[in-house]
Curated annotation (Swiss-Prot):
It comes from the Eukaryota. Keywords: Amidation, Disulfide bond, Ion channel impairing toxin, Neurotoxin, Secreted, Signal, Toxin, Voltage-gated sodium channel impairing toxin. Its main location: secreted. Beta toxins bind voltage-independently at site-4 of sodium channels (Nav) and shift the voltage of activation toward more negative potentials thereby affecting sodium channel activation and promoting spontaneous and repetitive firing. Belongs to the long (4 C-C) scorpion toxin superfamily. Sodium channel inhibitor family. Beta subfamily. The lineage of its organism: Eukaryota, Metazoa, Ecdysozoa, Arthropoda, Chelicerata. This is Toxin To12. The keyword Signal applies. Disulfide bonds join 30-81, 34-57, 42-62, 46-64. Pfam families: Toxin_3 (PF00537).
Length: 83
């Protein structure tokens, strides 16, 4: 029984570790703006385009939570926006 509980907890932790968060990028590598977007846009965008669990407008850019590890999100150190 203890082994089963440990297995389930370990399996749940894998999901937490493999999920990440961050800003989605547009085609130029810039943060995806939500400045003039309707309410709920970022959540829909994150879920449909990045398979994220949720998202919101962290004015002025969308921010996504629960992004799968294989999806790219904006990174300060590898920023290619406007270059």
């Amino acid at each position: 029984m203890k082994g089963l509980i440990l297995f389930i907890c370990g399996f749940m932790m894998i999901g937490v570790i493999l999920a990440k968060e961050g800003y989605p990028m547009d085609h130029e590598g810039c943060k995806f703006s939500c400045f003039i977007r309707p309410s709920g846009f970022c959540e829909r965008y994150c879920k449909t385009h990045l398979s994220a669990s949720t998202g919101y407008c962290a004015w002025p850019a969308c921010y996504c939570y629960g992004v799968p590890a294989n999806q790219k999100v904006w990174d300060y150190y590898n920023n290619k926006c406007g270059k």
